[in-house]
């Protein structure tokens, strides 16, 4: 298992190749704005989440702070390679990648 911090371009490549994208923000944050295809699994309940058999999982939050602070706990949720999107959805938007607004 890998635990690696990546930028938005690397995250986009992984997601395009089939990685599971998990938004760890609370449901109201995800509803207001999200990355298309991202699954919402808030940190408050991530421990019980079924992440399936994905070979790679990319976690993100708004700015990267929550995922960075919880990286070890997040990596314990799956046997897959774990990636943390540095800068979160803010970095994704700054890279020009699409977001969906509620």
PLM regions and their residue ranges:
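Rhodanese-like catalytic fold shared by cysteine-dependent sulfurtransferases
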Residues: 1-20, 24-58, 65-102
């Amino acid at each position: 298992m890998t635990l690696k911090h990546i930028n938005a371009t690397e995250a986009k490549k992984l997601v395009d190749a089939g990685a599971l994208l998990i938004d760890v923000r609370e449901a109201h944050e995800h509803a207001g704005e999200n990355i298309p295809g991202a699954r919402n699994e808030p940190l408050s309940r991530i421990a019980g989440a079924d992440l399936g058999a994905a070979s790679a999982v990319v976690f993100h939050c708004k700015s990267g702070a929550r995922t960075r602070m919880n990286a070890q706990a997040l990596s314990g949720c799956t046997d897959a390679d774990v990636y943390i999107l540095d800068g979160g959805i803010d970095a994704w938007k700054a890279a020009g990648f699409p977001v969906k607004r509620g």
